């Protein structure tokens, strides 16, 4: 947690802050000692106080064990009631990472599961109490998905639950892809986005967002250089990509079908894409070029942040070469850099302050239809 007296907003001129917006942590897993996914220990008052101290709003992002659905419903009910009473003004929504994931990546495996129709209805009902998005894999039902063995002919499909979620204010957040068939996965990206827009969404905001671009998806490039050995090759590798020559019409060829589909739809204003700017989830120059192509107005910086060495009932650890959190098997589980540090990184890579403000505040307020300190909008 940031213990400095200077808040994230204080890093910017008053003119940029004049609209009354605050920066938004749009995807984060833990502030201070609390793991948001530990529903027994989740301290909403502590999170609110941390947000005030850092000068941010937050959308805490939880992993959900199937046996905790009752507790999750109770938590969002309490959250909504307190918001209605004017409390928790800096906690501007709740999010889930999963449970419908084709590749669990750094997500605890026990929090990846295939909801029944009734469970989707229960999750959708949480929309009225502040659930603003759930990360899901567009290729979750395809060959190569980690859920493949659990899918039976009667399992609800996207056509059954995406309209239900979206009409309840719960956005699909696209991520955690299989690597088996990138072209097919990209086609499913388009399908989910079409379904969301055809599901009666009338705004405010947008009906689809993403998990972090370039992570947990099939790629045609090396997107990150996390070890000392990898960084020794970094400059030569990134130079070979000729970033300045990247164009959206060549994104499939350069980056691969899945990131290209996401970036194309973001640039068209149909979705908003999240990207991490800690320089470790994604190389900062690659992230910068992707943002330039999509537009800052269509992009949100996310931290994927966890402040403690525990997340979703699993122990985490740091490696010597970076600030990321790792699972025991060496898979990246989360980031640890707060938004203030990512602001500094964005400045060092040539973004103007008005562009950075758009990335950490403006786009999120538009996409989630926030007002004042933040009130999530509903369709």
Model-found features: residue ranges?
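Divalent metal-dependent hydrolysis catalytic cores, especially in the metallo-beta-lactamase
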Residues: 25-38, 45-72, 88-103, 127-146, ...
């Amino acid at each position: 947690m940031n213990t400095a007296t200077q808040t994230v907003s204080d890093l910017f001129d008053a003119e940029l802050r004049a609209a009354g917006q605050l920066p938004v942590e749009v995807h984060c897993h833990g502030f201070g000692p609390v793991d948001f996914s530990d529903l027994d220990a989740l301290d909403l008052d502590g999170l609110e106080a941390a947000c005030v101290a850092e000068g941010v709003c937050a959308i805490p992002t939880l992993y959900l064990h199937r046996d905790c659905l009752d507790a999750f419903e109770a938590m969002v009910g309490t959250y909504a009631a307190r918001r209605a009473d004017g409390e928790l003004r800096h906690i501007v929504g709740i999010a889930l990472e999963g449970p419908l994931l084709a590749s669990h990546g750094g997500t605890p495996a026990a929090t990846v599961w295939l909801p029944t129709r009734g469970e989707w209805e229960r999750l959708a009902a949480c929309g009225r109490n502040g659930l603003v998005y759930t990360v899901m894999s567009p290729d979750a039902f395809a060959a190569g998905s980690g859920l493949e063995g659990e899918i039976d002919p009667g399992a609800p499909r996207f056509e059954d639950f995406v309209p239900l979620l979206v009409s309840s204010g719960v956005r699909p957040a696209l991520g955690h892809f299989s690597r088996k068939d990138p072209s097919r996965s990209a086609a499913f990206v388009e399908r989910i986005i079409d379904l969301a827009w055809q599901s009666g969404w009338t705004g405010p905001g947008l009906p689809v967002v993403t998990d972090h671009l370039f992570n947990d998806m099939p790629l045609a490039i090396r997107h990150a250089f996390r070890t000392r050995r990898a960084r020794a090759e970094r400059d030569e590798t990134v130079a070979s990509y000729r970033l300045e020559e990247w164009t959206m019409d060549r994104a499939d060829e350069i980056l691969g079908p899945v990131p290209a589909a996401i970036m194309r739809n973001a640039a068209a204003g149909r979705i908003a894409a999240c990207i991490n700017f800690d320089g470790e989830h994604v190389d900062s120059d690659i992230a910068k070029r992707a943002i330039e192509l999509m537009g800052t107005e269509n992009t949100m910086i996310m931290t994927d942040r966890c402040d403690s060495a525990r997340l979703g009932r699993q122990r985490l650890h740091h490696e010597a070469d970076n600030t990321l959190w790792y699972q025991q098997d060496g898979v990246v589980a989360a980031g640890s850099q707060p938004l203030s540090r990512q602001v500094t990184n964005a400045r060092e890579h040539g973004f103007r302050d008005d562009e950075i403000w758009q990335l950490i505040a403006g786009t999120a307020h538009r996409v989630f239809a926030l007002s004042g300190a933040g009130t999530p909008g509903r369709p």
